[in-house]
């Protein structure tokens, strides 16, 4: 424990907590401090000027990260007939209808994303208590309820990241791995920030983006200059 504490203190000392860094500087700092024995995730957190308890201040959308996430995403698709075939051809890990409903209802959860064709939502809706708390319920706002299941599967596999504001007014996501190049992480960070700014709700007043922080799994947070956050 002492060694871990010493390492944490050493990492803290490399970051000036009174400063906001450029995206490129922040990426370099975060990567240089990602010294765990595993490939740490690089994570972004954005504090927003919204109160999510109001319907017109909800923030939810999806962004395709240009350099991917570095994670293997398992995709389940609720579809029938030709649409089921299209989903499988696009790389879905499990495809079904009533049979998949029974599996999931029985506790099967070996997937990270759920996609459904519109005609399947009557069935999928009955899984709300199972999928909802895990953030897995398909939603047309983020492109997971769609007749174009093939594209949705490709997006999910290729770096599509859903985000939703939390009670404290924060959105966060993984934007890569420490093993990614600086340029790839920078592209992902900029894409995520842009997507959040575009998702500004009608009820948001004043400054929308209040704070942007980049960190690794075991590292300390590094503040990003809001001028670069396009607020």
From Swiss-Prot:
PROSITE patterns: RIBOSOMAL_L1 (PS01199). Transmembrane segments: none annotated. One of its GO terms (molecular function) is rRNA binding. Keywords: Repressor, Ribonucleoprotein, Ribosomal protein, RNA-binding, rRNA-binding, Translation regulation, tRNA-binding. GO terms for cellular component: cytosolic large ribosomal subunit. Pfam families: Ribosomal_L1. Belongs to the universal ribosomal protein uL1 family. Binds directly to 23S rRNA. The L1 stalk is quite mobile in the ribosome, and is involved in E site tRNA release. Part of the 50S ribosomal subunit. HAMAP family: Ribosomal_uL1_B. NCBIfam families: rplA_bact. This is Large ribosomal subunit protein uL1.
């Amino acid at each position: 424990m002492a060694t871990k504490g010493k390492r944490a203190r050493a990492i803290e000392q490399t970051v000036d907590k009174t400063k906001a860094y450029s995206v490129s500087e922040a990426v370099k700092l975060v990567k240089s401090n990602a010294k765990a024995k595993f490939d740490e995730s690089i994570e972004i957190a954005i504090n927003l000027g919204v109160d999510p308890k109001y319907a017109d201040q909800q923030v939810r959308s999806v962004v395709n990260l240009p350099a991917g996430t570095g994670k293997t995403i398992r995709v389940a698709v609720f579809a029938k007939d030709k649409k089921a075939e299209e989903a499988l051809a696009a790389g879905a890990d499990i495809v079904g209808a009533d049979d998949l409903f029974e599996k999931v209802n029985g506790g099967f959860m070996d997937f990270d994303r759920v996609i459904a064709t519109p005609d399947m939502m009557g069935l999928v809706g009955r899984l709300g208590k199972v999928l909802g708390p895990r953030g897995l319920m398909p939603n047309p706002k983020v492109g997971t309820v769609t007749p174009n299941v093939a594209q949705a599967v490709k997006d999910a596999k290729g770096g599509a990241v859903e985000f939703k504001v939390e009670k404290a007014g924060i959105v966060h996501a993984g934007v890569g791995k420490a093993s990614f190049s600086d340029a790839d992480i920078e592209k992902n960070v900029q894409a995520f920030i842009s997507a959040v700014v575009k998702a500004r709700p009608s009820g948001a007043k004043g400054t929308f983006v209040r704070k942007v922080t980049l960190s690794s799994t075991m590292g300390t947070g590094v503040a990003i200059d809001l001028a670069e956050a396009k607020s």
